[in-house]
Amino acid sequence: MKHIPRFYVPDEISDQISLQISPRQMFHATKVLRLKEGDKVRIFNGTSGEWECAIKNIKKNIVTSLELIRKPRKEPGPNIACALINPTKFSIMVEKITELGVQNIYPVVTEYTQYKTFNRQKIEQIIVQACEQSKRLTIPTIHDVINLEKFLGKFSKDQKLLVGVEKENTTGNIECLNQNDMFLVGPEGGFSDREVDMFNAEKSVSTFYFGRNILRSETAAIAFIAFWIAKYI
């Protein structure tokens, strides 16, 4: 039995219409998986569920929708903010937390952040491919880069920001995580003393001690998402 690949398309999907997939997607289907015209693929757009389609025209990258096989549904997942880190490591982090079900990703600039921007086109492609691979129906949002001080102003008593720090004198505990709380991952150099003091002064921010082991930023992000899943899924 041939493997049936899943592909994301940005277009609206309905019954018995022609859709154009990307050259990359058609190459994977026909050159890697050796599919031919008439063979089946699966398509999703983040809002309309998952559809079984048939390859119609390989040269023009056209498929035809046949049947809705997974209805649209909400996919609960956490939100995370992360200081920008080395582009390769940032890409790995985004890929893994997307597979785990993150809903929103907020890139943040802190005092020790060495990188101020990210390659949006590349990151969005990584997100799409991670959703295709993990059988997600929804696509997480990668937001614009924001300064840490401005980011802290987004929170209220109804939503808290949890920050993992390397010091033991903290104001909270990750066990107190609520479903709509957000986690902030620090940069490769950690947070400055001024930033930690700023966290401790904010009522909407809780710091917690991640343990004796010093985690890489991408590891901390994955660990938090895994903890959220264990508690709420």
Stretches with model-predicted labels:
Residues 19-21, 75-79, 180-182, 202-210:
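Glycine/charged-rich beta-loop-alpha catalytic/anionic-binding loops adjacent to active sites
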Residues 155, 159-198, 204-208:
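Active-site/ligand-binding-proximal alpha/beta "capping" segment
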Residues 12, 68-69, 110-113, 212:
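Short, ordered loop/turn segments at secondary-structure junctions
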Residues 193-233:
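Structured adenosyl-cofactor binding patch, chiefly the S-adenosyl-L-methionine
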Residues 1-71:
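N-terminal positively charged helical leader segments and presequences
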Residues 71-160:
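RNA substrate-binding interface of SAM-dependent RNA methyltransferases
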